[in-house]
Amino acid sequence: MNEIICYGKSVEQYHVEKDGSRLVVRLGTFDRAAHVEWLQKHPHKRPKPQASRTHVSHFYGAGSICDKTGQPRETEVKLKCVTGQSLSSVSLYLLEPHTCQYILGVESPVICSLLPLLDEHGLVPADAQILPEKSADEEIVINEIKDEL
């Protein structure tokens, strides 16, 4: 199994069959209104104040219907700042704490520079400059990681 996250759009899981075809299961789709509603229902998931913020969670709902529950799949995407590693390092993990309800963790030093830009919902405001003053090398790495997300 492999997971693909297109940040701000969708999370998908795919299986490559023996014939080379891919079976794609959508684990969730991002919708700002659904994310804000999810934060209201789960206040402990709201971003901490900027001074103490080390991670944020985003809600991706309305995924493929789960065969076992009959409900749409959903995923919490946890973006976590980690330090002491190469700027280009990224760690990913996928958990399924409940049937067809997932947690996709994304941990990277790049996230550290994004956290101060986020609003009270943990989202990047439309007018925010995504890349604060960084060297050209850092900007390339950030863009590559954003493309992977």
What does each of the following model-derived ranges do?
Residues M1-L149:
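Long, low-complexity, largely intrinsically disordered segments
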